[in-house]
Amino acid sequence: MTTLIIIVAVLGGGAVITLIGARLIERAHQPRGRFIDVGGFRQHVVELAGNPQAASPPVVLLHGAGSNLGDMYLALGERLAARHRVVLVDRPGFGFSARKKGEGSSPADQAVVLREVLGRLGVDRPILVGHSWGGTLALTFALDFPQLVAGLVLIAPPTHPGVWGLSRFNAFLATPVGWLFAHTLALPFGAIFIAPGSRTAFLPQPLPQHYVKRSAAMLVLRPATLLANWADVGCLDAFLAGQAERYGTLAVPTIVLNGDRDRLVPPPQHCTKLAAAAPNVKLIVLPGFGHMLHHAAADRVADAVEEVAALSSAT
């Protein structure tokens, strides 16, 4: 009986901390852009105006798992906006974008939402730049809607099953047990470990100064966002098993960048296989770099965008 009382007290206290903490996080990190309604759910977008004299294609930046558009803004937004119109989106369920409860976790679902968002914004045949899970989304979009894409720059994208070794664990967290954890203990513990976790993602490069604050990384600790993230990662292995069979049909210019020390998405298990299967893919493996190439090797990513822009204009 005493044990039960302790458990209830801990969970109850965690629930109160989570409720208050989520509100404080949202108060500290306000939306950067505007909202577009897609099927009754608001999608948060930020637009950066490019050089009006340039004929460069627009660029759409897609963030990875457990993140939000602030990460891509911090790494590439202003840099690419010098030459391109840049659009950043919070993927459904992340940042300040909403999604229907229990739905929208697969890259195919999110590609449909992205198509609607870009259509509303009048973004014509952009270059999609996606990091990690966002790279998978960009790849799916190009396979499903090739006529709507000028090209791809994929940064450490999961392309085949076996993602991070975490898909089964995240699928478990998407169950009612995960719901209870997300609404009670995940935020208090996550607030302690989010900086060390971010540091691990950047290895072997150092974590940029004030990264957690400047990227609004704490937004992922809100219960709904945690559940969305667990569902997204949990479904990825099964989704990629089917999508991998389509890579030979990829029809747009594509550059893939990966670090040879990326432990989250190792090149041999993912990008190397994609490049072997898809004739339009150019693979660049950077020695000594890890998973967060868009920060650690931003110049190389920007160069890849310009190369894809040139290739797309020549076709």
Task: Go through each PLM region and give its residues.
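Flexible "cap/lid" loop of the alpha/beta hydrolase fold
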Residues: 143, 152-183
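Conserved alpha/beta-hydrolase catalytic His-Asp/Glu region
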Residues: 167, 186-249
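Conserved loop-alpha-helix segment in the C-terminal half of the alpha/beta-hydrolase fold
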Residues: 255-289
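Active-site loop/oxyanion-hole signature of alpha/beta-hydrolase fold enzymes
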Residues: 46-49, 53, 88-129
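Alpha/beta-hydrolase fold catalytic core
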Residues: 1-58, 82-84, 123-124, 310-315
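Gly/Ala-rich beta-loop-alpha elbow adjacent to hydrolase catalytic centers
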Residues: 130, 134, 138
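Catalytic active-site module of serine/aspartate enzymes centered on a nucleophile-bearing elbow/loop
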Residues: 279-315
